[in-house]
Amino acid sequence: MKQVDIFTDGSCLGNPGPGGWAAVLRYAGTQKELGGGFSGTTNNRMEILAVIEGLEALQEPCTVNLYTDSQYVRNAVEKKWLDSWQRNGWKTAARKPVKNKDLWLRLLPLLARHTVKFHWVRGHSGHPENELCDTIARGHASRGGLPPDTQAAG
C-alpha cells in the first residue's frame, strides 16, 4: 500500500459560525492542498470534515499518517468512542445523542478502507503543515457566500 501523510485542520469564526476545513496530502514528494467551508457550522464539524475530505481524496487504499490538532477526532477513533457510540445506538455514555453522527458515519468506511494512524500536533505551535492547514481553513471560513451546514444541529 502507498504511504501518505495527511495534515488536517478545521476553523470556525464563532461556534457556531462560518467555518472552514483544510487537508494537505503528501505522497512521494508531491503535495495536494484541499479546503472548503460552510456557514452555521462548528469547529468540531470542520475538524471531522477535514479528515473525511483528506481520506476521500485517496484513489486507492493507503497507509496513512494523519496529523490533527483535534483531540476530539483523534480520541473518537483511538479511544474507541466510535465503537461505543455505535454499540449504544449512537448515544453517549450519558445517553444523549452523539453529535455529528452524519460525519462519523461518513468517516467509518474510510477508516475501514485505509490503515490510518492518528498523530496529535499542538495547534498554533509553529508546526508548518498545521499552520498551512490553519491558514487554508481560516481563508475558507472568512469567505462570504458559504453554503449552509444543514446538518450542524445534529
Swiss-Prot record:
Its main location: cytoplasm. Residues 1-142 form the RNase H type-1 domain. Its EC number is 3.1.26.4. Endonuclease that specifically degrades the RNA of RNA-DNA hybrids. Its cofactor is Mg(2+). Mg(2+) 2 binds at D9, D134. InterPro entries: RNase_H, RNaseH-like_sf, RNaseH_domain, RNaseH_sf, RNaseHI. GO terms for molecular function: magnesium ion binding; nucleic acid binding; RNA-DNA hybrid ribonuclease activity. Mg(2+) 1 binds at D9, E47, D69. Belongs to the RNase H family. This is Ribonuclease H. SUPFAM superfamilies: Ribonuclease H-like (SSF53098). It comes from Oleidesulfovibrio alaskensis (strain ATCC BAA-1058 / DSM 17464 / G20). It is an enzyme of class 3 (hydrolase). It catalyses: Endonucleolytic cleavage to 5'-phosphomonoester.
